[in-house]
């Protein structure tokens, strides 16, 4: 059976490995392995490769080591985690730290699923390369990326079992320890043998003759639960300690005691002034002495309380009573200082200053009236009041009827040098030049603003300045619209400068573009339609046109995907014709859905092989030790005579290729 799977050291890899064997040269650092799908089929490794046919994933090596049984074998290991997948694996490649492909191999086809596909697994890939000198290869990798495989763990466990690399035991960790039969050792690193344990047990099993304990030495002691003993040879039991604590807990603390019941304290003598606690007897005696010292003052207080009816709210009662009294004021004094006389009327000339004025008959008549209406009638002002009731007030008012201006009247608002005016121009009846005008002036800053107010919200609708009209809300024009000229297109259209050049709506969802009354473009239902040629450039032009005679519509589409970033494709309703595609490696391919038929085949004939054949037969005699085939030839026969050395014939024929009308012998590597 022929060998189907193999590993090949590339030409570049062999050169690097050979150079690394020279003294003082840097070792080859193999750091990375890549996997590929071979472009969809099992590839054959080639020493001339500089990369995989179609790489799908690469990562740093998990392990690189020298084979234990074959000293010139180097084993490289790659681990693919479960979350990586979704591809076929048919080829492997080893790369050094400079990115050079050192070795390439094919492998049995295997699909690596991704977790998102519902299945996942760890997968280990190994490549074995044979080198003439292992010393030329760096066998260390970044340990932060290493993951232990099952084989690695098994090897390390077996190696550890055969080694003596185990820690010694200590008081905090397990480990190896040395035995000892000593019974008086203070070591904390030796372990006692059964012999030492037995000796200690036999000693402990004998009679104990220890002495009693005293206040000066350790020893045996007897327990006691007594709480009033003065012994210095007995030891208190927990019961005795609890009894004492229970009694202690019944006592009040020295600092801020919380007393209950009716505690008593000694009565201090009268006149004592310190921090001693005062009992009720001391307080009552002090109060009695105070009363006896000033009997007249207490009697006065008793009499005052009786006079007030023993009112406990005396202060509130007095405040309420004073609240209704007239405060003392200079106003009454000012009025009281006036001299009374007939036909005199008092009035104030200043703060708390009064004077008298002469009261006339009219004044007496007005004062005699009981209503405002009577005063108005007396003064003859009724007509004036009637007119004022329907007048527009100077400080602002609301008109309930119409307001009419005659002739060329102007309604103006003026402040300093700024103004706003509304006027009407009409020279005579029947005048054809009648109009209403609006004028503002503010040193060139004037403009007209039309605004609307709803509730508390104000919104600007339009502004008109000296050089621009700005409409701030949606505007509806029922008819055609012309910019700089009248509109000749009619309907719902806009013309720009030229009366028949612009845009026109010619139906639901249809917008046409006109130039000199000629329809040149249409936008309809998401489609742009050109009724004339589409031209790019003004001197050397690129033109796109249609004669409208094709049986199918043509589509030129630019699209892309993750595996095909850029595709420029031409096709019709039946399928695609050709496309140009940029790949993920930035290369470009051109594909035709059919046969290419150039008018001149010369370019193809000069570049491609049209036929292959075996050329004229060549015969060579074989000498002892063998003979290699000629360059570019293959052996087609042998003629073995066997009588003498050098009379056997080897028949060769050259391998020839036919290019552009000429047969060429193939070259040999």
From Swiss-Prot:
<dbReference type="GO" id="GO:0046718">
    <property type="term" value="P:symbiont entry into host cell"/>
</dbReference>
<dbReference type="Pfam" id="PF12571">
    <property type="entry name" value="Phage_tail_fib"/>
</dbReference>
<keyword id="KW-1161">Viral attachment to host cell</keyword>
<keyword id="KW-0946">Virion</keyword>
<keyword id="KW-0945">Host-virus interaction</keyword>
<dbReference type="InterPro" id="IPR022225">
    <property type="entry name" value="Phage_tail_fibre_N"/>
</dbReference>
<comment type="similarity">
    <text>Belongs to the tail fiber family.</text>
</comment>
<keyword id="KW-1230">Viral tail fiber protein</keyword>
<keyword id="KW-1227">Viral tail protein</keyword>
<dbReference type="GO" id="GO:0098024">
    <property type="term" value="C:virus tail, fiber"/>
</dbReference>
<protein>
    <recommendedName>
        <fullName>Probable tail fiber protein</fullName>
    </recommendedName>
</protein>
<keyword id="KW-0426">Late protein</keyword>
<keyword id="KW-1160">Virus entry into host cell</keyword>
<dbReference type="InterPro" id="IPR048390">
    <property type="entry name" value="Gp34_trimer"/>
</dbReference>
<dbReference type="InterPro" id="IPR051934">
    <property type="entry name" value="Phage_Tail_Fiber_Structural"/>
</dbReference>
<dbReference type="InterPro" id="IPR005068">
    <property type="entry name" value="Phage_lambda_Stf-r2"/>
</dbReference>
<feature type="region of interest" description="Disordered">
    <location>
        <begin position="251"/>
        <end position="272"/>
    </location>
</feature>
<dbReference type="GO" id="GO:0019062">
    <property type="term" value="P:virion attachment to host cell"/>
</dbReference>
<dbReference type="Pfam" id="PF21446">
    <property type="entry name" value="Gp34_trimer"/>
</dbReference>
<dbReference type="Pfam" id="PF03406">
    <property type="entry name" value="Phage_fiber_2"/>
</dbReference>
